[in-house]
Structure formats: structure tokens, C-alpha cells
């Protein structure tokens, strides 16, 4: 296991900004304005959810599984950042990912429903707000993972598989 190879982790605000910026570029080219609004809203909700959830799962997978790592590595993690705090932060990020996907699946059918463009945009805005609030709720977990990553990058790389002769 190499703790130095953990990829860069974005802050919660950077993640939100990136997701909303990418979603703003999504548009449908349909003549009927109500239908266009529904299609665009659905695609934008999916875009925001994907651009928030996909980096989160990669952050969780970037850190080692504590059940399968060498006891020495586990002790190093525990002494530097604390295994319990790291597990808590990773768990919070995984919870937020699941919550965002659940919000997306809840709001997409509502955005698809036959209604005016104005109502559809309100539903889309509500979905955006809920998803970004979930990410902001766990901003301290992102900050902790960023600091843990910087601490891990400064640690020496010790090969625990080869014998010390």
C-alpha cells in the first residue's frame, strides 16, 4: 500500500462549483419550451449528481481498506491522522454520495412530469439546493481528507512486504 499515491482531493466548494459549471452547459434543442425545460432539467439534475457523486466514490476508493492493510501501515495512519477520524470522514463522504444519488432519483421524475417550464426550473433549483447542501454539510470531512493526504505524502515509503535484514 502506498499512501503517497492518493490523488488530489477537491474541497466541497470546488466540487460544487465544478458540478454546477458543467451542468450549466447542458441544453436540449427542442422547439416546445415546456418539453425543452423538462429534458434540460432532467439532464442537468443527472449532471450535477454525477459530477458530485463520481469524485466522491474515487476519494473513498483512493484510501486503503483498513481490514486488508499491514498492521504497520495501520499504526502509521493511526499515529498521524487517526484511523477512527479517517473512517468517519470516508463514511461521511460515502453517505453524502448515496444521499445525492437518492435526491437525484427523487427529483428526476418530478422534473419529467408534465408541467410548465417555470415549475420545472423550480424543481431543478430545489434539487440543486438539496444536493449542494449535502456536500456543504460534510465540508469538514473533505478538509480532513485533504490534510490527511498532505500528511501521507510527507511520510517515507516503507515496503512492509520485504524483510528487514
What is the predicted function of each stretch?
Residues 1-96:
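N-terminal accessory targeting/assembly segments
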Residues 11, 113-119, 157-159:
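Intrinsic-disorder/low-complexity, polar/charged segments
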Residues 90-149:
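Charged, amphipathic alpha-helical linker segments immediately N-terminal to NTP-binding catalytic cores
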Residues 147-160:
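Pre-Walker A adenine-sensing motif
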Residues 162-165:
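Glycine-rich phosphate-binding P-loop
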Amino acid at each position: 500500500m502506498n499512501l503517497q499515491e492518493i490523488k488530489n482531493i477537491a474541497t466541497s466548494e470546488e466540487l460544487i462549483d465544478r458540478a454546477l459549471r458543467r451542468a450549466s452547459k447542458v441544453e436540449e434543442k427542442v422547439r416546445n419550451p415546456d418539453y425543452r425545460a423538462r429534458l434540460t432539467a432532467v439532464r442537468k439534475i443527472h449532471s450535477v449528481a454525477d459530477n458530485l457523486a463520481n469524485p466522491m466514490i474515487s476519494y473513498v476508493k483512493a484510501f486503503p481498506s483498513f481490514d486488508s492493510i499491514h498492521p504497520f501501515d495501520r499504526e502509521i495512519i493511526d499515529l498521524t491522522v487517526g484511523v477512527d477520524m479517517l473512517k468517519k470522514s470516508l463514511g461521511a463522504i460515502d453517505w453524502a454520495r448515496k444521499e445525492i444519488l437518492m435526491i437525484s432519483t427523487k427529483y428526476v421524475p418530478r422534473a419529467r412530469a408534465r408541467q410548465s417550464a417555470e415549475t420545472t426550473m423550480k424543481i431543478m433549483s430545489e434539487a440543486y439546493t438539496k444536493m449542494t447542501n449535502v456536500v456543504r454539510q460534510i465540508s469538514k470531512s473533505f478538509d480532513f481528507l485533504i490534510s490527511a493526504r498532505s500528511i501521507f505524502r510527507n511520510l517515507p515509503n516503507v515496503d512492509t512486504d520485504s524483510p528487514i535484514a
